[in-house]
């Protein structure tokens, strides 16, 4: 009944300390949006609840003000329709 020792590797936080959550920061927001344009869950993002709320509000603002579209056009251009 020996328990195998697995090496524990600490993951890097998805949002670095210098990054601000802002609706104009599209490169940050795209990391938290799926290929279908959906906001990824907090468990998949490994965010705190406060960070997830701020990300959600920023994505919704970006969709309305149009820096970020509702659907990700990059995934659509890679497949031929």
Curated annotation (Swiss-Prot):
Matching Gene3D superfamilies: Ribosomal protein S18 (4.10.640.10)
Protein name: Small ribosomal subunit protein bS18c
The keyword Repeat appears for this protein: no
Pfam families referenced in this protein's UniProt entry, alphabetically: Ribosomal_S18
Chief location: plastid
NCBIfam families referenced in this protein's UniProt entry, alphabetically: S18
PROSITE patterns with a match to the protein in the record: RIBOSOMAL_S18
A Gene Ontology term for the protein's cellular component: chloroplast
Swiss-Prot/TrEMBL keywords: Chloroplast, Plastid, Ribonucleoprotein, Ribosomal protein, RNA-binding, rRNA-binding
Keyword Metal-binding attached: no
Quaternary structure, from the entry: Part of the 30S ribosomal subunit.
Gene that produces this protein: rps18
Record's subcellular location: Plastid, Chloroplast
Sequence similarity: Belongs to the bacterial ribosomal protein bS18 family.
GO biological process, one term: translation
GO molecular function: small ribosomal subunit rRNA binding; structural constituent of ribosome
């Amino acid at each position: 009944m020996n328990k195998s020792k697995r090496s524990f590797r600490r993951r890097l936080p998805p949002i670095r300390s210098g990054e601000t959550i802002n609706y104009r920061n599209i490169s940050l927001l795209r990391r938290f949006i799926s290929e279908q344009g959906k906001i990824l869950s907090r468990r998949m993002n490994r965010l705190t609840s406060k960070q997830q709320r701020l990300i959600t509000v920023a994505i919704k603002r970006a969709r309305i003000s149009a820096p970020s579209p509702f659907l990700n056009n990059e995934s659509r251009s890679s497949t031929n329709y």
